[in-house]
Amino acid sequence: MNQKVHNQIVSFIWSIADDVLRDVFVRGKYRDIILPFTVLRRLDALLVPTKDKVLEANAFLIQQNIDDKKALENQSGYPFWNISRFTFETLMNDADNIDTNLEAYLDGYSPNVQEIISKFKLRNQLETMKEAGVTYLLIEKLCNKEINLSPNEVKNSKGETLPPLTNLGMGYVFEELIRKFNEENNEEAGEHFTPREIIKLMTHILFTPVKDKIKKGTYLIYDPACGSGGMLTEAEHFAMEVTNNKADFMLYGQEVNPETYAICTSDMLIKGEKSENIAYGSTLSKDGFPHLHFDFMLSNPPYGKTWKIDEDAIVNDRGKKGSQNIKDNRFQIGLPSISDGQLLFLMNMVSKMKHNTEMGSRIATVHNGSALFTGDAGGGESEIRKYIIENDWLECIIALPKNIFYNTGIPTYIWIVSNKKDTKRKGKVQLINAMDLYEKLRKNLGQKNCEMKSVHIDTITKLYMDFVESDISKIYTNEYFGYNKITVERPLRLSSKFTPEAIEILRFDKSIAEEMEWAYTHFGNDLYKDIKKYNAKIEAYLNKNEVKLKPSDKSKLLSALNWNKQLELMQAAQKIADKLGDKQFDDFNKFVHLLNKTIKELKLNIDVKGLKSIIDSITWKNEDAERVIKKTEKGGTIIYEADSDLRDTENVPLDQDIQEYFVREVLQHIPDAWIDESKTVKGYEISFTRYFYNYLPPRSIEEITAEIFELEKETDGILNEIVND
């Protein structure tokens, strides 16, 4: 489409808002009028040439008592029609009744267009337009002879020929209007569509490698986050071009935003596609095509956006682990963080791949950097990457220039996924760094400040097709991105010693120690005799200080039985201390044996909980103490208790032996460490920028000094005088 003509149409439609809607609607509501009326004007322009035929055919159907209007499609030439007697042009013939006639005009549309009108919520605006008297002005503007929204050439008021507006060109107009309205309203500019050059790149990579495999027949193209349908349209256009129109392509999509869904549906109708192939609603919570599989899939799903609203449809209980908790089979592999659902869209596409055809399925999808590396081994994100890579479906990842999108300046990447790789690609993944392949824009569009030209797209496509390494193309084995996350444990080392302070701690129950200590400080030993007379004061203290205790803890705090039980435990500990003295024991294993022996000798009645309380009060971690033994196995192997505070993890690349790595990287520095093999888990991440990092050594002191003194010459020797002084 001619850029000048495109700009003229967009500017004219944009100006209608200020010319007609100012003071009638707030600026944020302009889009609610302009977008649906632009769609309707386009549909009207398409139907005008066959209007009389449709009216005649409809009259015949009425005469024959035939309610099914499907036959009208044959007369209109499109999968939609309008059986009212009005067009946009004829609505202006009766200015006094234009509002009533407009409603009749809208009612005359076929059911599929009625749904579009409904999704735009257009009828909600008609009363306001009527009261303000702007309906005629709006229709008049849209019928202006200076712009052409029809698919045919027309003459303007000067007799000049205005070029036809193709379906593709109309799509561009819609998307630019959406972008401008979003930008005007400080919304996500471009949230619902992708820059055309990025779609062009995606379609090149998607179709070029298999163009010779595409035969006569029908192929299905799918976008699970289709927005206004631009990606589907471009994909079909390029697919037809690259295959010399020898195959048919059917477009399928799903969109959650009602406005962009309406635009997409109207675009499909205009092109003769089935509007029912565009599903409305959330792809994640309500799959529009649960039983279909597709040949080609491409998408730019939302990233960094929560899927909380879809959660109930996907899982039974978010807190529970395991695939049995996941309702939707598309997502059985794993669930990403609730704050970012982009990888769920990828898994939705993966679930719809064809496995029983020669070509299989090909996917091109845009993600931000977090999809490459976010998530620990065993977590949802890592499990999704693991599933795709270990099935050998990931072909390539292409890093795009920053600020190439309208709504974000963060790094973005195209993933190419295929379940029928070429032989040369099997077991390998290609990374292409296209971050520097762009040309600056003269004026920013939202956050978009650059664009890819055809030369850049051709360069990337050639790199992909050649499958060779270069400065901006790297090829790695699948295993290169995987690692084993091992848990490194170190032994618990404890020392024990009876001290007056440690024994005194036992006076108070650990779970309510602070509250018991306050009560004892204020009421002393009387608490052991008659605590009831202090209950009111204790409760007043709790209320005043807003202390919230569990009912069971509050009961213990006010219980004489509990106070005396703690006193008995403290007194028992004192008897043990009298027996063992104040010696420090640095071998916990021997100490516990001695402690139990002493308790037995003193005939003390201490339960398991009480014994633990005593040990906890007199024991602390000491790196110089002996290791605490957990158990000794039959063969004599000693298993030590692990110190959770010293627990660490290491990521061992899959191509390295875990034990060799452990000896080299861990035992050399921490001789008493060991691996808890029960916790070893495999993960995958793609640290894209690391693979293309070029180390630049710092300049030498001599070089820097020479440069400084070279600059010093320009300052009349001042620096030299300072240095010499």
Predicted regions: what they are:
Residues K29-R42, Q332-V417, I708:
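Conserved Class I SAM-dependent methyltransferase catalytic core
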Residues E188-S299, Y303-K320, L343, N368-S370, ...:
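Conserved S-adenosyl-L-methionine
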Residues T233, A262, S299-P301, L343-M347, ...:
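Feature representing long, continuous alpha-helical segments
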Residues Y406-R507:
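Flexible, glycine-/basic-rich loop-and-beta segments that form/coincide
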